Design a protein with these regions (language model features):
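N-terminal secretory signal peptides
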Residues: 1-39
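N-terminal export signals
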Residues: 24-28, 39-61
Length: 369
């Protein structure tokens, strides 16, 4: 992909597939209204993250479930509340496939897993109570300290929460094998209760932000994720000349190429193993900055997958000369990669981040960008 183009404006063919999927007009103006129920969210999402439930939301959680009000429990309550007609539109078998492959595993930078207009989470397809549950379980997947930042990203990129996001549920939440997926522009996130084997986050995820328009300035002012790149660039500045030479690569790979490499194929970049103690400490800070937006259980799952494959020491850090906005030597495009860990950060023309973390390199990637 050239730097003159972006997957946001060259939409995947999958946007126009069967099942009523419609193409997204990325740059079309959107209504700036906010559909979220902030009063409800102050209780439901905060308590979900804190593992305790306020009496303000009894209509969502039964007394028996109050001891464990996770996003997973909310998926189950949502599923139980859906009518047969609703289930026919947003619920699928575990192994459902279409032109996008195994649908529950698909990831892209700008897509909708179900029709974003007819089945939008903020539209008339869902009842008010169902909308509240979806909002609570969605924000329950994030660190509470990040809720306002996630709202800002959704406002900047999609006109706000509930405007053009869609969901799907795979399998049966009544069993131990299910997955909830929410999608939209710069959004793919999952909730699976660790029922998807070998992977963190329930599978590959995507996040991004175009804070000040499609083409951001080199400063990326207002971008809620740019601090991650600054943290990584801080490590680059700590490297000596030889280390920088290993870390800096001329051209970035295609951003969606986030699959795991075959055994024996060397990962480009500077091995974390070769860093000094203070540099390794900073590398851990980079990792923490990457996983910080998410709930504790998902952060722990990432660390567990890393540990199963030698930890951060087995990863490599690469920065790319191509796409350096402002030619300022602050590398907009970079990647942290290990045998079963890919975190690809593309900052030009705005932020796209592809995440693929597992404990087993045999897990295939189903990405399109």
């Amino acid at each position: 992909m050239s730097l003159d183009s972006c997957p946001d404006c060259e939409m995947p063919v999958a946007q126009t597939l069967n099942s009523g999927h419609r193409p997204v007009e990325v740059d079309a103006p959107m209504d700036s209204g906010d559909l979220s129920r902030r009063g409800f969210m102050k209780t439901a999402t905060a308590t979900a993250a804190a593992m305790s439930v306020s009496a303000a939301v009894p209509r969502i959680l039964s007394a028996r479930e109050e001891a464990k009000p996770t996003s997973e429990n909310l998926v189950k309550k949502l599923y139980e509340s859906l009518s047969d007609k609703q289930k026919a539109e947003v619920c699928f078998s575990w192994d459902h496939t279409d032109d996008r492959g195994l649908l529950r595993t698909h990831v892209s930078n700008n897509w909708n897993i179900t029709d974003e207009k007819e089945l939008a989470i903020g539209g008339s397809f869902f009842t008010r109570n169902q909308q509240d549950m979806i909002e609570a379980l969605f924000f329950g997947l994030y660190n509470p300290d990040w809720h306002s930042k996630i709202r800002k990203q959704l406002q900047d990129d999609a006109g706000g929460y509930g405007k053009s996001q869609s969901i799907a549920i795979f399998g049966s939440p009544a069993s131990d094998k299910f997955e909830f997926v929410m999608t939209g522009r710069h959004l793919t996130i999952r909730c699976d209760g660790n029922s998807t084997e070998h992977v963190a986050f329930g599978g590959p995820i995507f996040y991004g932000h175009a804070a000040s328009g499609f083409n951001e300035p080199a400063s990326h002012e207002g971008n809620v994720y740019w601090h991650q790149a600054l943290k990584a660039n801080g490590l680059y500045k700590m490297l000596d000349g030889k280390q920088q030479q290993k870390a800096l690569i001329e051209k970035a790979p295609h951003e969606a190429a986030a699959g795991f490499r075959e055994k024996g194929i060397e990962i480009p970049g500077l091995p974390i193993l070769e860093l000094s103690a203070d540099q390794k400490s900073h590398a851990q800070e980079v990792l923490q900055a990457l996983i910080e937006p998410y709930r504790t259980s998902d952060q722990d799952e990432v660390k567990k997958c890393l540990a199963a494959n030698g930890g951060l020491d087995q990863c490599r850090l690469a920065f790319y000369k191509s796409g350096d906005l402002g030619d300022d030597g602050v590398w907009d495009n970079w990647r942290l990669e290990g045998p079963t860990f890919v975190w690809h950060f593309r900052g030009n023309p705005h932020v796209h981040v592809w995440v693929n973390v597992a404990d087993n390199a045999s897990v295939p990637l189903n990405a399109r960008g």
